[in-house]
């Protein structure tokens, strides 16, 4: 396999088979033998580019990113599609490729070995690599051309790349076919973890020069990006207790007193799209695809709010409340109605080794929908199962006549009954926790002592929180364009800042606007979700 992090130059003579077999004989013919084009193609994995999120500046040219893990960056194989005559990714769907070439796993393994030999000759130890941001290949291409036209000028070539999806040269013969193409899957899950992340062009910009000779090759620079997105949990702010993140819960009243501890046991992605998106990102003015552009830019305004949509293959179906069949097709077993099972007792608990390094929950496909449909049945999010442990305001008895509470010491995993006042805003210092239900009810209904509250039971102290992945909008304005959603090659990272008491005693997928979940979103280089308040 080949990493996309170092520069490599090799010469490969291509017996490139273009689309002649699928094209009318009277329109296309091979270029004359001996009149070949010499090309230097540089593939640049999007590892030093910009964010689509506000960190602090959002949009296609934002400023937040981070490098991917090694297994996310590996290049196993790739197919090159060549456009000529100034054609671009947004040209007519009937546009014919003037050339195609597949670089197989075996070829890249050989190239990798040659590169390692070069390093060894230069004194580098076996296995050590010189890390760069690009990989360069040099090769000759016999071109297929239109009979009625001269050969394309060297500066009119554009290269389209799809990596880690095998040989596509016989699958796609026109630009329209390729643009409508979708991978079988955007990554491959194995017993050792995810591998073979499918990648494709990140933009429609090509840096080219040269005349196409050996001495002056056509130099093309193509930036590629992963089709998958990643969701991370950032445990910063927690203390690890035997690998379990534990948070201090404090009230907002003066004193900064620790009122409870929150132990985070399990997490799972909900509404993770099971359907891969198109090979190339699509943007449009609205969810229906008006003024659709391939590899277009997301365009935010000053506050980070998006002004256009990224379109996935199902976006136009997500403009009204869904039916069960659509939700099952989109999200499979990860649909939010299955949240309880996703963090059930048969699922492993978190066992972290660091409270400063992000923990990857998993990978998801693009998932975008109409802004008015920003509800929990479409939005990709995370369900978090925790144990809540009151440290203050825990009582073992209550005398309703004297209105005297008997304080006690809470034991972790003990069932408790929370009394919460019936007020519009509640601080954690206003909640009371009781060892038995009778005392909790007596206190909550003791109107003679001006107590007005509700009682909630927490079996074994277990509670649940939900949060949903925000893609744009760094202010708390609800239902803006692309506020919630998943876009390729982003890392959606969330923090927990517990300050609102225990979550719900059973999974309760509330609407996104009720969660106050601000999410950091960076390019992969990464997407960070702002702090999620739970």
What is each of the regions a protein language model found here?
Residues 1-18:
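Sec-dependent bacterial lipoprotein signal peptides
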Residues 16-43, 233, 489, 531:
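Bacterial Sec-dependent N-terminal signal peptides
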Residues 30-65, 228-234:
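Contiguous beta-strand segments within globular domains
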Residues 36-40, 134-138, 217-219, 230, ...:
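Intrinsic-disorder/low-complexity, polar/charged segments enriched in Ser/Thr/Lys/Arg/Asp/Glu/Gln
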Residues 64-169, 234, 240-488, 498, ...:
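Tryptophan-paired
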Residues 118, 123-125, 166-219:
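Structured interaction patches on ligand/partner-binding surfaces of diverse proteins
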Residues 217-243:
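Extracellular secretory-pathway ectodomains of glycoproteins
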Residues 478-534:
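Hydrophobic, glycine-enriched assembly/anchoring segments
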């Amino acid at each position: 396999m080949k990493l996309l992090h170092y520069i490599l130059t090799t010469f490969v003579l291509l017996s490139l088979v273009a689309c002649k077999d699928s094209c009318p004989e009277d329109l296309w013919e091979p270029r004359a033998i001996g009149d070949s084009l010499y090309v230097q193609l540089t593939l640049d994995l999007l590892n030093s580019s910009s964010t689509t999120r506000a960190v602090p500046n959002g949009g296609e040219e934002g400023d937040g990113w981070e490098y991917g893990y090694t297994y996310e960056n590996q290049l196993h194989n790739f197919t090159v599609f060549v456009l000529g005559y100034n054609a671009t990714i947004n040209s007519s769907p009937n546009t014919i490729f003037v050339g195609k070439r597949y670089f197989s796993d075996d070829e890249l393994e050989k190239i990798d070995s040659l590169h390692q030999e070069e390093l060894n000759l230069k004194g580098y130890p076996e296995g050590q690599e010189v890390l760069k941001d690009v990989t360069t290949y040099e090769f000759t291409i016999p071109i297929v051309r239109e009979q009625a036209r001269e050969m394309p000028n060297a500066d009119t070539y554009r290269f389209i790349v799809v990596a880690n999806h095998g040989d596509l040269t016989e699958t796609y013969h026109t630009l329209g076919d390729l643009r409508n193409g979708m991978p079988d899957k955007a990554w491959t899950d194995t017993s050792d973890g995810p591998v073979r992340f499918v990648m494709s062009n990140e933009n429609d910009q090509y840096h080219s020069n040269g005349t196409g000779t050996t001495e002056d090759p056509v130099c093309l620079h193509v930036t590629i990006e992963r089709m998958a997105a990643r969701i991370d949990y950032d445990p910063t702010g927690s203390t690890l207790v035997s690998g379990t993140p534990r948070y201090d819960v404090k009230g907002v009243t003066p004193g900064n007193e620790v009122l409870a501890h929150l132990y985070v046991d399990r997490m799972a992605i909900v509404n993770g799209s099971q359907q891969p998106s198109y090979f190339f990102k699509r943007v449009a003015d609205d969810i229906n695809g008006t003024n659709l552009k391939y590899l277009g830019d997301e365009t935010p305004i000053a506050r980070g709010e998006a002004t256009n949509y990224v379109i996935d293959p199902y976006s136009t179906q997500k403009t009204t409340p869904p039916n069960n069949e659509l939700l099952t097709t989109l999200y499979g077993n990860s649909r939010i109605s299955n949240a309880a099972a996703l963090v059930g007792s048969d699922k492993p608990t978190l066992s972290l080794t660091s409270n400063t390094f992000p923990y990857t929950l998993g990978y998801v496909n693009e998932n975008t929908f109409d802004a008015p449909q920003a509800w929990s049945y479409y939005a990709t999010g995370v369900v978090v199962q925790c144990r809540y442990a009151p440290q203050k305001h825990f009582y073992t008895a209550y005398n309703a006549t004297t209105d005297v509470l008997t304080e006690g010491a809470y034991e972790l995993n003990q069932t408790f009954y929370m009394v919460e006042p019936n007020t519009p805003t509640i601080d954690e210092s206003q909640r009371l926790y009781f060892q038995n239900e009778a005392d909790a009810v007596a206190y909550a209904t003791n109107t003679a002592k001006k107590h007005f509250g509700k009682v909630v039971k927490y079996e074994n102290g277990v509670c649940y929180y939900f949060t949903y992945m925000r893609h744009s909008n760094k202010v708390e304005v609800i239902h803006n364009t692309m506020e919630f959603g998943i876009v390729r090659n982003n890392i959606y990272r969330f923090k927990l800042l517990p300050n609102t008491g225990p979550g719900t005693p059973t999974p309760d997928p509330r609407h996104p606007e009720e969660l106050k979940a601000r999410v950091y979103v960076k390019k992969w280089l990464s997407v960070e979700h702002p702090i999620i308040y739970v």
